[in-house]
Each structure stands twice: as structure tokens, then as C-alpha cells.
Design a protein with these regions (language model features):
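C-terminal outer-membrane beta-barrel translocator/porin domains of Gram-negative envelope proteins
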Residues: 1-89, 105-106
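Intrinsically disordered, low-complexity segments enriched in Gly and acidic/Ser/Thr residues
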Residues: 88-96, 103-110
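Transmembrane beta-strands of outer-membrane beta-barrel proteins
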Residues: 12-16, 94-98, 118, 127-129, ...
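Residues that define the transmembrane beta-barrel architecture of outer-membrane proteins
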Residues: 10, 76-82, 110-116, 121-123, ...
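Outer-membrane beta-barrel "beta-signal"
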Residues: 120-126, 146-170
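Transmembrane beta-strands of outer-membrane beta-barrel pores
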Residues: 4, 18-25, 98-106, 124-126, ...
Length: 170
């Protein structure tokens, strides 16, 4: 994860993820790379609704795996995943984001994914909202149930709070 804050108070953030299973096979296929929300089987992620598949708590976003904010059908791989996430400051708390990724399952064709949108960075790394605009699914904002696609970050880790208030605000 690389972040750069420019003198005009705009931020650039770049993240790259590469995951490859060397010994995963079809008979023992318990481990996978995920584009977005992981299954959190180790219980290390701070999900508010870990087992939620619908509703507000299912929309929580934690930067893990491919870091995608859009929700896709079958967004996982048992072999290879390459992903990058780019955020660019637009104006005050508004940032544009771009997610690009490639998934490859064993004995399957490669699948390409992308997602773009606007990030409302209210409290960096603590409370953020992601509004998808376009993705491999098509134009996201046209969906009549668009509110189900909005993702949020809400961190309750003490380290996040300390980092939040130790930054220069003025």
C-alpha cells in the first residue's frame, strides 16, 4: 500500500495484490482468494456482521484480498489472483477509485474484473463510504436497488482511532 499526500491536500493511493496457491487442488479446495469481502474464516477481520449475506451489515468493506468495492457473482479463485486498487483525491473528502483484477481457477479460463466509483472519505481509515459507478457488472448507478451496492468502512480498532487523531488536521 503506497500513499502520497500532495501539497494541495490531494491524496494518491496505490495498492497491489498477488495471490497464488502452489499446492491447492480440486480435492482439497478450502482456501480461496477473494476480490472483495472475504469469508473471514480466521476471525481476524473486524466485521460487524460476519455471516450476513444481505442487509446493511453485509455491505461493510474491509481492505483485504483484491480490495474490490463492487460485488460480483463468484468473486473468488482457487489458483491465482492479481489485483490493483487506485484512489485519487478529487475535491476535499471526495476521491475517485479504480479496481482492476484478474482471477484464474484451476483448469478454467482467466476472468477479468474492474470497478470504478466515488469514495467519500469522512474519517480516513475509520469511516468511509464507497459509491460504485461502473464495474464488470455494467453501470451500477442505474440499478433501482443501488443502495444495496454502497459499501462502508467502519473500524473499531484502537490503532485506527489513534492514527486518526494523531494526524495533522489544521
Amino acid at each position: 500500500d503506497y500513499r502520497k499526500l500532495f501539497k494541495n491536500n490531494r491524496q494518491f493511493q496505490f495498492r497491489f495484490y498477488f495471490g497464488k496457491f502452489l499446492w491447492n487442488n480440486k480435492s482439497y479446495d478450502n482456501f480461496r482468494n477473494y476480490l472483495g469481502r472475504s469469508d473471514g474464516y480466521l476471525l481476524l477481520d473486524e466485521y460487524l456482521g460476519r455471516s450476513e449475506s444481505t442487509g446493511l451489515l453485509s455491505q461493510q468493506f474491509i481492505m483485504a484480498g483484491g480490495g474490490f468495492k463492487s460485488i460480483f457473482e463468484n468473486p473468488k479463485s482457487n489458483d491465482l489472483m492479481i489485483a490493483t486498487n487506485i484512489n485519487i483525491g478529487l475535491w476535499k473528502w471526495f476521491e475517485g477509485y479504480l479496481d482492476l483484477g484478474i482471477l484464474k481457477d484451476k483448469d478454467q479460463k482467466t476472468r477479468d474484473f474492474y470497478g470504478t466509483g466515488i469514495k467519500l472519505n469522512l474519517l480516513p481509515d475509520f469511516f468511509e463510504l464507497y459509491f460504485p459507478i461502473s464495474s464488470s457488472n455494467g453501470i451500477e448507478i442505474d440499478d433501482y436497488r443501488y443502495y444495496n451496492k454502497i459499501r462502508f468502512v467502519l473500524s473499531y480498532e484502537v490503532d485506527s482511532l489513534i492514527n486518526l487523531f494523531s494526524r495533522k488536521w489544521f
